[in-house]
Each structure stands twice: as structure tokens, then as C-alpha cells.
Amino acid sequence: MINTSRRSSRNKPATPAPELIKAEENPSDIHEDFADLPEPLLLSEARAENMPAVGSAISDLLKVERAAPLLIGNTVEEMVTGRLADRGLGELTEREKIILAIGIHCGESSMEHMNFLVTKRWITEELKTQLTSLAATTRALTEAGSLHRTYALLQSPDQAKKQEALDAMVTPQVGIDITTLNHEGLEDIWQSYSHDAKVDAVDDYLRNILNVDPTPLYAEDEWGRHIAFIPRWQLVAYGKNSDQFKTVYADEINYQRESLERILAKRVKLN
């Protein structure tokens, strides 16, 4: 029979609790009794300083860097080294240098592309302005040449030439095929019109194409907004061949006439 003393029983190590054994098997696990204990402040600060937040977008990191001061005029490596020192980080590894080089290259390409787009937009606007001026000048020269020729024929002692000038003045000429006209070109011609020329063209269009008296509109300031539904290119195209215009765009003319008549009816009620 083996006798065990009370002393030997007291010195025998107790069996650890099951949850403690599990925690020892996986040191990363935290027992629920200690889960609410905060980390030491210095450890939390070190982690926040040296490790970026999980899921941080590049745009968020760029905002922070753009707000940081840089020593402009230094090389890229000097500026990068300075920023890394400010952030408490060491020198770049080879992989990080490759990433930085890719970022710089992409940034330079984006900047060059943006400059290209700005230059292209400026060239386009400049060409459009020049084409508008050219169209206006060409039209003015054509009209001046036609008037000069008519005047010369009228002053000619030859009765046949005088009669030719008179016939040209009273006989409507055959218009061009307006279906072949470029709408953007017609818009440019419209933009080249003076204010008075635009008003005259609108008045002639409303009276002779839509067969509507627009006089009630003219008493109202900014009356032009009521005819905004009429395409501006049509205000130029109809003058090229009014007979063909009335035939080809008959449905649009009816719609425009009905719309304008409703607008005029409302204006009369308001007044």
C-alpha cells in the first residue's frame, strides 16, 4: 500500500483548464476573459504608423501625400527619401522602387495625355472659329459679287444685258439640294450671322415657312426662347431651296407650326 502525504499532494501541479490549453496551442487566440483589454498605447501607435489601414484606396493615400510638403527642385529620389524619413520608413526595396517607377511613368503619361486633350480642344475651337469666319466672308463676297454683276448689267447700254439683270432679280433661281447639306456647317453659318440678320431670318422663317404671325412674341423680352425647339440649321437651310424644304420637312414644319400656335395662344391669354 502506497501512502501519499498531504505535502506531496500540495506540490503536485494542477491540470490546466481546457480553455487555457487551447490558448497555448494557438497563441494568436485571445481568451474571452481578456478580449476587452486594450493594447498598450505605444503598440497601437506603432502599428498605425507603420502599417496602412486595410483596404486603403490609392486615392486616399494620394490625398495625404498631396497635402505633405515637398522640396521642389530636388530629384525624385531625394524627394522620396525625404518623405520616407518623415514617415519613419526605411529605404525602398527593389520591388518598391519598381512600383514607384511605374507610378511616375503612369503619372507622366496621364499628364501628357491631358495636355494633348487640352491642345486638341483648343485647336478644334480655333478651327471652328476660323471656318465660321471663312463661311461668313465667303457668303458676303458671293453676295457682293452677285450684286456687283447685277448692277453692272443694269448699267450696261446693251438692252439684252439689262433684261438679263431684271430677269435674274424677279425670277426665283433653282435652289440647291438641301438634303446634301452638312448640318454642322449650316450651324456655323448661323453663328456667323449678326443679331439683326438672325432676327430677320427667324421672322422670314416663321412667316413664310410656318405661316404664323410672330408679332405677339416680339412684345416680350427674350422671346427667342420660345422658338428654341426649331433647329438653327433649318433657319439657314430653308433659304437655300424653300420649295424643297417645305416638301422634305413637311412633318417637322407642321409640328413646329402647331407648337408655335400653342405658345402664341398662351401669350395672348397672359396679356
Swiss-Prot record:
It comes from the Viruses. Phosphorylated by host kinases. Residues 1-26 are annotated as: Disordered. It is found in: Virion; Host cytoplasm. Transmembrane segments: none annotated. GO terms for cellular component: host cell cytoplasm; virion component. Its main location: virion. Keywords: Chaperone, Host cytoplasm, Phosphoprotein, Viral RNA replication, Virion. Belongs to the nucleorhabdovirus protein P family. Non catalytic polymerase cofactor and regulatory protein that plays a role in viral transcription and replication. Stabilizes the RNA polymerase L to the N-RNA template and binds the soluble protein N, preventing it from encapsidating non-genomic RNA. Homotrimer when phosphorylated. This trimer is stabilized by binding to the L protein. Binds soluble protein N, and ribonucleocapsid. This is Phosphoprotein.
